[in-house]
UniProtKB/Swiss-Prot annotation:
The gene is SCPL35. GO terms for biological process: proteolysis. Its main location: secreted. PANTHER family: SERINE CARBOXYPEPTIDASE-LIKE 35 (PTHR11802:SF280), SERINE PROTEASE FAMILY S10 SERINE CARBOXYPEPTIDASE (PTHR11802). This is Serine carboxypeptidase-like 35. Keywords: Carboxypeptidase, Disulfide bond, Glycoprotein, Hydrolase, Protease, Secreted, Signal. Belongs to the peptidase S10 family. One of its GO terms (cellular component) is extracellular region. Disulfide bonds join 95-363, 257-270, 294-331. It comes from the Eukaryota.
Amino acid sequence: MKKNALWLLCILVLPAIACGRKPEKKVTISSSGRKEDDLVTGLPGQPPVNFKHYAGYVNLGPEQKQKALFYWFFEAQQNSSRRPLVLWLNGGPGCSSIAYGAAQELGPFLVHDNGGKLTYNHFSWNKEANMLFLEAPVGVGFSYTNNSMDLQKLGDEVTASDSLAFLINWFMKFPEFRSSEFYISGESYAGHYVPQLAEVIYDRNKKVTKDSSINLKGFMIGNAVINEATDMAGLVDYAWSHAIISDEVHTSIHGSCSFEEDTTNKTEQCYNNFKGFMDAYNDIDIYSIYTPVCLSSLLSSSPRKPKIVVSPRLLTFDDLWDKFPAGYDPCTESYAENYFNRKDVQVALHANVTNLPYPYSPCSGVIKRWSDAPSTMIPIIQKLLTGGLRIWIYSGDTDGRVPVTSTRYSIKKMGLKVESPWRSWFHKSQVAGWVETYAGGLNFVTVRGAGHQVPALAPAQSLTLFSHFISSVPLPSKRF
């Protein structure tokens, strides 16, 4: 089967499968309980900075000593004790928040030069908050288990429960942040991860003492997988409205594929008609439709094909090509992969202490199954809105994979009353996007000219968006 046909089969039919190498041996967890042992002091290529950062493992509990999740934590650049704590999650499922979020989007050190250099990110989100990046679930990045059966039980529910266990134990390492305002943010399939983790924290907080609770205030998700039916309809309509697919392809898909709830789209006619959709994206980047694709080598003009991570249901594969703002290079996914496979880097980050039997990969090659993935996050979002959490949903408007149309359709399905009508918002002298506020405080924000990974293509605008979110301040309505 040709690669594009496999991709199409995956998004329409198959359950979660991520092709890659299978672990050949068990590993033993070694995880310090002292944060001082996780302090990073000699990261290769790191520019000088005036803040501390930590990396290492956290065991998931006395009954789960075989499982440990890997983290990288950056203190805020100023007044860290008075700044909020923000957990960032990437999607997939199976993609690393460190290889993508930290190293290619919003962390303070961005990987360049084929993994040989780190550059300082002037728009890092740790300018505004203490930033915690987590590789979850086990099997992602450096996170691991010594029980191979754990890899057969992965899904949304396990990811949420393991992430909660991680946080509880992480706060034991970093008790000074236990009372900090806590937010969760992420993109793509983190449209599942983030609300689900927020819900288990919210529910747990009702059962424990204040001293044991997590001071959850809200979450922000970008280009997020939210609701299967509307996400899929928006995917097709976006391609048509942006002149990527023809009228004929658009009409044939709508005529043969159902975009109603609880449908599977497994018909042969739907599959065949979707081939035209796939063909249209063969030579452009679906995650950022107006930027160049990565070429496989300097000697070849053939586009470098993205790694395809097949995820549950229709909308959840996510290869997450990165897009850096200055000196744009669409090949930096491989740069991050090369960097984190370096032994000196792993030693500096206290990573891979058990010598995993497979190389580091930005998207996991060992997760073969994904057991559960609800078709919609809308009930959870509505529950947490009612519970008083601050929720912002943003969308880079040049992403074709989880496009702005999908997000608009999903929010419309929530049936919320508009409180502040659609308006432009500004970054300095330019329109940065548009914003609309709904009952309960839900903000929907677009980011003009940004693709799937908003912090990478619109770094200054994303930092403005982030700072206003955590401050609960309306986005600028005038030039400044």
